[in-house]
Amino acid sequence: KSIQPWDDAVTLVLTYAEIPFDMLYDREVVGDKLAQYDWLHLHHEDFTGQYGKFYKNYSGEAWYKKQVRDSEASAKMLGFSKVSAMKLSVAIKIKEFVAGGGFLFTMCSGTDSYDLALAAYNTDICDVIYDHDPVEPNFQSKIDYDQGFAFYNYTVSKDPLEYEYSNIDGTDQHKSIPEEQDKFFLFEFSAKWDIVPTMLCQNHTKEIDGFMGQTTDFRTEFIKSNVLIMGDNKAMGTARYLHGEFGEGTWTYYGGHDPEDYRHYVHDLPTDLSLHPNSPGYRLILNNI
């Protein structure tokens, strides 16, 4: 995997907590390496093959060009016609990993882009600037919501330059309120009847400061009825923290990029977790280990 010009909350907190981990990417996942593991943690990923939809603002930067070169080289080496096909294969491998009993935890754009990649398996939502061929006309009608874990009835963005995959994300709603008022609230569960959600929501506070991301949180109108919402902001109509089962395994989606950096921009320095030893937002990541 290429080093990206932003921090990764998952590897930051695993490193800070001295929890050993291996790093895998497309080649290893397609090569069935996931079978060697029980837990898979993801962060700011794009499973649709649109390179995070950074084209408008960053396509001229060296890191973006390298990401495209590396991804196209990997796709070619693995026998795929284009990057989006490789990313779909990766998404399906992860789904099989969960079905077989694995645990998936993913943050930021690794949530909605993952669901969308699975739902768009039978169509082409990537425009020319991403995969060198046009989108399929009327691709929205071919979105199969049943294939994804968490979301349904959403509309896919048709603008290749928009920094958004669909209308699942609630980021725009957060732009209208002051940072100090941006919160989400954890649900309380019975340790007797809801053991896993109870563990995932353990914290010293139920009120947690919000934080932005490419995917900040999820509009509840698009969340499937069988998905467990563990943290939300009812006033905004958004959920931040989701959990569900699939096959023999489970998955958790956590919106936002960095729990201790309200707006983490490209090229910002990584967060120093030694300054935030009791971070409730980072605690939720550690609960998923």
What name fits each language-model region?
Residues A75, V98-A99, N138, H264-D272:
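Flexible glycine/proline-enriched surface loops and loop-helix/loop-strand junctions
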Residues K56-N57, A119-I125, D268-T271:
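Short secondary-structure boundary/capping segments
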Residues R27-V30, I92-I94, Y130, T216-D217, ...:
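Generic recognition of flexible, low-complexity loop/linker segments
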Residues T220-I289:
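Extracellular ligand-binding/catalytic regions of CAZymes and related secreted enzymes
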Residues M107-V227:
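An acidic, glycine-rich "communication" segment
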Residues H43-T48, G110, A120, D124, ...:
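Short loop/turn segments at secondary-structure transitions that flank enzyme active sites
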Residues I3-T111, A117-A120:
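Helical hinge/lid and interdomain linker segments adjacent to catalytic or ligand-binding clefts
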